[in-house]
From Swiss-Prot:
It is an enzyme of class 1 (oxidoreductase). Its cofactor is heme. Pathway: Steroid metabolism; cholesterol degradation; Lipid metabolism; bile acid biosynthesis. InterPro entries: CYP450_sterol_14alpha_dmase, Cyt_P450, Cyt_P450_CYP7A1-type, Cyt_P450_E_grp-IV, Cyt_P450_sf. Changing residue 103 to H: Correlated with elevated serum (24S)-hydroxycholesterol levels; 30% decrease of 7-alpha hydroxylase activity. Residues 1-23 form the signal peptide. Changing residue 23 to P: 60% decrease of 7-alpha hydroxylase activity. Liver specific. This is 24-hydroxycholesterol 7-alpha-hydroxylase. GO terms for biological process: bile acid biosynthetic process; cholesterol catabolic process; cholesterol homeostasis; digestion; sterol metabolic process. Its EC number is 1.14.14.26. It is a multi-pass membrane protein.
Length: 469
């Protein structure tokens, strides 16, 4: 018995050490999982996901996992987790979004993975800073044309005003003029279907289409629209230099590498990416500017010094003009900081350690630009609209402020970010040059219902405009 006891003790000791090491290696962040199988805390999370994330951070600390709708989402909020999110080779962007792309645009996963990098390189080249000068002239012309439709004066919801300007401008520039009808009934249809598709995009990315009848109908409407118009879009060439529009270049890659059957689906995905964020950014920027009289006055003085005081002329906006109106660019960037997307995501492909926790493969690693931009450590007085903070950004070298993540970061940042900034800047310049504008309602609260993209306003915000004389 005396000989057995030491042996048993050694075995038990080794077993205890092994279990201790295993426990250490498998130590995971606190998990909020609820009690309903598969759904988890999906109902609570879905009611107000942005608020849910912040409350969880306060309660559980800088890293925590949320189990909802069959997904484990691990949120990181401090430097170490952010660095892993941005730099680790153990996390992957494409695998994180492939299901979303499949559900919202019906693009097969194998097709998406095969084409994504090629399309990204094309988009980045075509929409990059080197080529921005090619867009300024047409942007100006398209915006002038749509501003004419507003008349000399009026009152309308600011969000609708921006939609009526930017929907046709963006489609005409990046897709083809034939896609956006001039027929009032069809224009109304386009607006209605896109708003439904956009507003429920997040639900469409997670739930079966049979539960989202109106969203599914809108999706099918756009797929049919592209299927009908793609032959004409492909046949149309630029009268100036025979160059291709963004959609034409996309279709060229899609049909060369796969099949023309996927073309309408990529048309829909590109349409959503082009319109879903530009419109709310322009809305919020105008709303912030018009609700800050000192900033509004400074911008108007800048516009008058560059273009003169009258608002009747169809001015042309050059790159030099934009440089002389930097305050407007700062306002756009400050708006994007305050109204950043709720989350960006990566998929964990190999277990990764963050703050002594092990995040297992299969988890979705989540970072919230919305809350990161409200951390006073990175942005002092984070809730205030302070465009002047952007003086510190090296915008000449196309660099943002540290920890500004609205366009993502790393290998797959938004490839059209500089075009989007240009479009919103020019939209604001031309509106404020042509019209005296004032808000009839207070700045609305934002909706906390969605995590994807720039948040929408919760209520209406009417604008009164009158042509400057």
């Amino acid at each position: 018995m005396e000989l057995i006891s030491p042996t048993v003790i050694i075995i038990l000791g080794c077993l205890a050490l092994f279990l201790l090491l295993q426990r250490k290696n498998l130590r995971r962040p606190p998990c909020i999982k609820g009690w309903i199988p598969w759904i988890g805390v999906g109902f609570e999370f879905g009611k107000a996901p942005l608020e849910f994330i912040e409350k969880a951070r306060i309660k559980y600390g800088p890293i925590f996992t949320v189990f909802a709708m069959g997904n484990r989402m691990t949120f990181v909020t401090e430097e170490e987790g952010i660095n892993v999110f941005l730099k680790s080779k153990k996390v992957d962007f494409e695998l994180a979004v492939q299901n979303i792309v499949y559900r919202t645009a019906s693009i097969p996963k194998n097709v998406f993975l095969a084409l994504h990098e090629k399309l990204y390189i094309m988009l980045k080249g075509k929409m990059g800073t080197v080529n921005l000068h090619q867009f300024t002239g047409q942007l100006t012309e398209e915006l002038h044309e749509q501003l004419e439709n507003l008349g000399t004066h009026g009152t309308m919801d600011l969000n609708n005003l921006v939609r009526h300007l930017l929907y046709p401008v963006t489609v005409n520039m990046l897709f083809n003029k034939s896609l956006f009808s001039t027929n009032k009934k069809k224009i109304k249809e386009f607006h209605q279907y896109f708003q439904v598709y956009d507003e429920d995009f997040e639900y469409g990315s997670q739930l079966p289409e049979c539960l989202l009848r109106n969203w599914s109908k809108s999706k099918k409407w756009f797929l049919e629209l592209f299927e009908k118009n793609i032959p004409d879009i492909k046949a149309c060439k630029s009268a100036k230099d025979n160059s291709m529009t963004l959609l034409q270049a996309t279709l060229d890659i899609v049909e060369t590498e796969t099949s023309k059957e996927n073309s309408p689906n990529y048309g829909l995905l590109l349409l959503w990416a082009s319109l879903s964020n530009a419109v709310p950014v322009a809305f919020w920027t105008l709303a912030y500017v018009l609700s800050h009289p000192d900033i509004h006055k400074a911008i108007m003085e800048g516009i008058s010094s560059v273009f003169g005081k009258a608002g009747k002329d169809k001015i042309k906006v050059s790159e030099d003009d934009l440089e002389n109106l930097l305050l407007i660019k700062w306002c756009v960037l400050e708006t994007i900081r305050l109204k950043a997307p709720g989350v960006i995501t990566r998929k964990v492909v190999k277990p990764v350690e963050i703050l002594n926790y092990i995040i297992p493969s299969g988890d979705l690693l989540m970072l919230s630009p919305f809350w990161l931009h409200r951390n006073p450590k990175y942005f002092p007085e984070p809730e205030l609209f302070k465009p002047e903070r952007w003086k510190k950004a090296n915008l000449e070298k196309h660099s943002f402020l540290d920890c500004f993540m609205a366009f993502g970061s790393g290998k797959f940042q938004c490839p059209a970010r500089w075009f989007a900034l240009l479009e919103v800047q020019m939209c604001i310049i031309l509106i404020l040059y042509k019209y005296d504008c004032s808000l009839l309602d207070p700045l609305p609260k934002q909706s906390y219902l969605h995590l994807v993209g720039v948040p929408q306003p919760e209520g209406q915000c009417r604008i009164e405009y009158k042509q400057r004389i």
